[in-house]
Amino acid sequence: MATTATPQLLGGSVPQQWQTCLLVLLPVLLVSYYLLTSRSRNRSRSGKLGGAPRLPPGPAQLPILGNLHLLGPLPHKNLRELARRYGPVMQLRLGTVPTVVVSSAEAAREVLKVHDVDCCSRPASPGPKRLSYDLKNVGFAPYGEYWREMRKLFALELLSMRRVKAACYAREQEMDRLVADLDRAAASKASIVLNDHVFALTDGIIGTVAFGNIYASKQFAHKERFQHVLDDAMDMMASFSAEDFFPNAAGRLADRLSGFLARRERIFNELDVFFEKVIDQHMDPARPVPDNGGDLVDVLINLCKEHDGTLRFTRDHVKAIVLDTFIGAIDTSSVTILWAMSELMRKPQVLRKAQAEVRAAVGDDKPRVNSEDAAKIPYLKMVVKETLRLHPPATLLVPRETMRDTTICGYDVPANTRVFVNAWAIGRDPASWPAPDEFNPDRFVGSDVDYYGSHFELIPFGAGRRICPGLTMGETNVTFTLANLLYCYDWALPGAMKPEDVSMEETGALTFHRKTPLVVVPTKYKNRRAA
């Protein structure tokens, strides 16, 4: 769904290991801070059009840290509280990095549409830069000719109808496995941790799309190790990097002293060894000719051999795009499915309404929902919309960076300013949504509001040039999975647990997920035919 989320960012206050580094580097950081603020004051005196700029309001800043201390473990919530005081366009300084946070639909429209071309580059964060093989993916590549070529390739090759059909096959195959597992659990009347089943499903879908049917077989000997390294990569990208907020020699030294650089290199090297093996296996002349044009790696290898445009495609491009696909798709789809099921377990009347729609549309005496049934379930799609409104997987959209001086809602924003869009705050803004904290899919009855980038009060996938390229595939995975969970089973909470007891506490960094597992009891739908 949403491509790679906010990198190395706001996942918490400054960790303990950095306190020693900051003390050791205090003199260097003080000098850097003085030089930076001196340059900022000089630029401010010159201003746009020869006058003083009208900068957005914001909280007072500490020396060195700027406003880093205000973020906390749930930055989207803290930033919403700050926006209530300072307004929907707010200026911060994160370390030495000038930053603007927008927290309303109108401000988001200015960033993502009106001034999209001014605000559509990406900051060169060191962690994502390394793991993307020097920004060779789509999610973190800076705006320019390279990014346009890559986006075109995505549209023509990776998101073509042939690829969509391959993804459909992967979904059907993995859903059969999930239903078989849940049938066994239902037969034993046991409670299950739904998280485990949902993550296995989404991992299987994306793995099959990327590497082919072998990913789900015992022949794929590297799967478990790859999953561990992938988890490490996602955790590392969400960790605090001093260089991300102090992009100078002092920040690099702090990362080196803390062990962050060594950890990043270890993860990168493990991923690289794995991807080299996968590419070599796909290029083996003895390998059978794949069906349906092959998997994602096959398509990318063919681009290496055949692409004659301005972009020279290499093995590093293959690795960067495959990693981008895994990081951007598995976690985001999984957390959306789990938040939807959590909300439905808290609202039994909504669960029954969605279930009745799915079962009426699909009919009785079927083993499960098929992909073509998705067009018949409009209310379930409202459930997905409402879930994404309340729980966007990336609460802060992937950061943008201004390419030139621009304005946002009348405020001057200099070039090279980092821009965050607080999608979580926008989805809960009472100016756009009555009873904004209530889960109520019926609010979309008769409404044309969607999440495809035209309605800025609902932007879990972003909008404009940088809208998530995998939106359609992610949306399909989520809707298809929820439809099957609701059709195939009745759901209950374990023991004497009541709907209001379902915890909605969240935690995370790259994506924000449930703090505790979702434990439920499935019962097989009595009118469903066995597979």
Curated annotation (Swiss-Prot):
Membrane topology field: Single-pass membrane protein
Transmembrane segments: 18-38
GO cellular component terms attached to this protein's record: endoplasmic reticulum membrane
GO process annotations (BP): dhurrin biosynthetic process
EC number(s) from the headed UniProt entry: 1.14.14.37
Main location: endoplasmic reticulum
Pathway: Secondary metabolite biosynthesis; dhurrin biosynthesis; dhurrin from L-tyrosine: step 2/3
Catalytic activity: (E)-4-hydroxyphenylacetaldehyde oxime + reduced [NADPH--hemoprotein reductase] + O2 = (S)-4-hydroxymandelonitrile + oxidized [NADPH--hemoprotein reductase] + 2 H2O + H(+); (E)-4-hydroxyphenylacetaldehyde oxime = (Z)-(4-hydroxyphenyl)acetaldehyde oxime; (Z)-(4-hydroxyphenyl)acetaldehyde oxime = 4-hydroxyphenylacetonitrile + H2O; 4-hydroxyphenylacetonitrile + reduced [NADPH--hemoprotein reductase] + O2 = (S)-4-hydroxymandelonitrile + oxidized [NADPH--hemoprotein reductase] + H2O + H(+)
Enzyme class, first EC level, given as a word: oxidoreductase
Pfam families tied to this protein: p450
Residue sites binding heme b per the record: R122, R151, R466, C468
Subcellular location: Endoplasmic reticulum membrane
Keywords: Endoplasmic reticulum, Heme, Iron, Membrane, Metal-binding, Monooxygenase, Oxidoreductase, Transmembrane, Transmembrane helix
Obligatory cofactor(s): heme b
InterPro entries (alphabetical): Cyt_P450, Cyt_P450_CS, Cyt_P450_E_grp-I, Cyt_P450_sf, Cytochrome_P450_71
Family: Belongs to the cytochrome P450 family.
Function: Cytochrome P450 involved in the biosynthesis of the cyanogenic glucoside dhurrin. Catalyzes the conversion of p-hydroxyphenylacetaldoxime to p-hydroxymandelonitrile via three different and successive activities: isomerization of the (E) isomer to the (Z) isomer of p-hydroxyphenylacetaldoxime, followed by dehydration of the oxime to the corresponding nitrile, and C-hydroxylation of the nitrile to produce p-hydroxymandelonitrile.
The protein's name in its UniProt record: 4-hydroxyphenylacetaldehyde oxime monooxygenase
Organism: Sorghum bicolor
Taxonomic lineage of the native organism: Eukaryota, Viridiplantae, Streptophyta, Embryophyta, Tracheophyta
